Amino acid sequence: MKKFTTFILTLIIGVCQAQNRDPEAQTLLNEMSAKVNEYKNMVLEFKYTLDNSEENIHQETRGNITLVGDNYVLNILGITRIFDGKKLITISPEDEEVTISKQNTTEENTITPSQLLTFYEEGYNYKMDIIQNVRGRKIQYIKLNPIDSNSEISYVLLGIDTNTKHVHNLIEIGSNGTKTTLTITAFKTNQPLSESLFTFDASKYGDYYINNLD
């Protein structure tokens, strides 16, 4: 789940730095990051797919995420994850369990949205790739290749709407042939949000097991 959350946040916030910089790609990435930073909040819906033809695997699911600064509420696979800036609350209705833990920003695959602005600072080379027309929208792809030759990732394609400067999708191709795609299906900004959105109310989960790891 940590890796999945990282993947989603990477798509939303995007990639802005790398070692081998294509100036044209760098300009587009900077514009995308600047646009994201303009918003007070973002409320997004997305589709997540995982495919591996050799293993005959196809998985598809949908979810949504609300972001305010580093705080977020993520709903995916029936699980809700709430990060309030200090603690990470994971709510699993299927298990009737709530897990509360501190967000350890030094732990691998545990990052916050603001940190994603430099997440790939030393990990990738990148360049402009193809342009696609998606229902009248011009989507420019940037191809990122990992510097580490032993990486489990073969390459990443980041699709950016050239008009809105919003991320359209992120496609990750694994070294084992697995293709993971995250596509934004709805993108709303500066929405009226409840002040208690990131507050966990234990009284609503009286029958749940509360696992406090602090």
Kindly give the residue locations of the regions a language model identified:
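An acidic-aromatic
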Residues: 62-111, 180-181
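Beta-turn initiation residues at beta-strand->coil junctions
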Residues: 48, 92-93, 171-174
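Flexible, surface-exposed loop/linker segments and immediately adjacent secondary-structure boundaries
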Residues: 103-137
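N-terminal leader/targeting segments and the immediate start of mature chains
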Residues: 16-56, 70, 204, 209-214
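Gly/Pro-enriched, hydrophobic low-complexity segments
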Residues: 124-206, 210-213
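Short, exposed beta-strand/loop patches in secreted or surface proteins that constitute
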Residues: 35, 63-66, 80-81, 127-133
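Bacterial Sec-dependent N-terminal signal peptides
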Residues: 1-21, 25
